[in-house]
């Protein structure tokens, strides 16, 4: 643990009812302030379980999660916007339950609308948005509470390939510009290389078996793909999770909050 960390996961253990081995088996993870960390791994490896435990949506058998210096916000695979509210109203919804509801909060929402390229859609309803636009609104809603840690559970998986490529570069710029610490789940290696400062390969019952730094010139998409393929083959031959969770894909609580959670 370091004073430079925004998030620490310490010894996280989780076993689902009926399972013989834990899906999270003493997982440790640190994400630095302003760092973007991307988690790759097979379906059923426990990636989403880990993210939900960090968010406080899933209880742990043991271990803890520390969020340092601010709030936490989460973006899910589907935008899940309220259909009867406008784009602006969806973004400001979370602010209604906070003390910072004044002019400064409204100005920040205006800034987000501009920065995210959706200011012209402020009065639109969700039914009038494309998939990429709706997910931008979902991300803006999470950023509106000014989180220190942003969790993203396959946020671009529902988008078509062209839109996904556009949005992933935009999302990386937003994360860097706002200085947010981000933890993202992805199945797409090229997406992970765009979004992440570090990429970790996650395995059920093991945790992170390999972590790469994307600023390392020796790290390539081919190297990560080969590791992904070899470990998926290993997992298939040595299952550590129930059969219902063993579908493998190759790419195409106890929460302690150090300074408030949003």
Question: Residue locations for each model-derived region?
Answer:
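A short, proline-enriched helix->beta-strand linker immediately N-terminal to the Walker B motif
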Residues: 144-148
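Helix N-cap at the start of a conserved alpha-helix in ABC-type nucleotide-binding domains
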Residues: 161-163
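Helix-to-loop junction immediately C-terminal to a conserved catalytic motif
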Residues: 55
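Catalytic Walker B motif of ABC-type/P-loop ATPase nucleotide-binding domains
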Residues: 150-154
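Conserved beta-strand-loop-alpha-helix hinge in the C-terminal portion
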Residues: 202-233
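Conserved ABC ATPase signature
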Residues: 125-129, 133
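Conserved H-loop
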Residues: 179-185
